[in-house]
Amino acid sequence: MNMCILGTIATGVETLRTRVEYNMERGASKYCSEWKLADTGNNGFVWLGNITDMEGMGAFLTTDEEMKWDKDNGCVYKLYTMSEMSE
């Protein structure tokens, strides 16, 4: 996993899970080979993904449709990139 999204969503984490599944079906899977979504309570979430094309995923997440969906659902988050630590 090389991307972490930490945030909250007013409409609930299951709403976000449904949206992520929808987005994967409509093309985000071209940029993300694996993902996990964890409910941290109080409408908080952590999303982890293995992004294979950062530019493509960035473009996908910043479309007018995605930005409107975030606003309509009260989804506020920060994105972080990660790298694996080895011994």
Where are these regions (language model features)?
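Short S/T/G/P-rich N-terminal loop/turn motif that feeds into the first structured element of a domain
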Residues: 1-69, 73-87
